[in-house]
């Protein structure tokens, strides 16, 4: 039985997105640390975001998934390196695909708890999780 004083984190189900306007997670399934950036922007699926999360030594995003999902991280339009440490592993160690034209990092994640932290300094605007159908 959960402690009634501790709100439970909603389970991530189906396709989920989380933006970081003001440096705050738009989805309560995600825990964010760090500060906002409003000096950069990102255009994602036709929508321009003017505020995101500084992905520096203080920035991190944590979440849990109960099934295999594809994660896409969307970085600022002028970020040259779209990388992240995923549970301490470098992008090259996770099988992630970085697209520096679209400013994304995409990787398949197994059911687990995840913490995303800085590999190279950047600006994170959105995370999208999509269930993998096998």
Where do the PLM segments sit?
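Short beta-strands within extracellular/lumenal beta-sheet-rich domains
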Residues: 44-67, 78-81, 101-105, 122-126
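Short edge beta-strand/loop segments characteristic of extracellular beta-sandwich folds
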Residues: 72-76
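Short beta-strand-plus-loop segments that form exposed binding edges in beta-rich domains
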Residues: 115-123
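Glycan-recognition and processing domains
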Residues: 10-58
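Ser/Thr/Gly/Pro-rich low-complexity, disordered linker/stalk segments of secreted
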Residues: 1-13
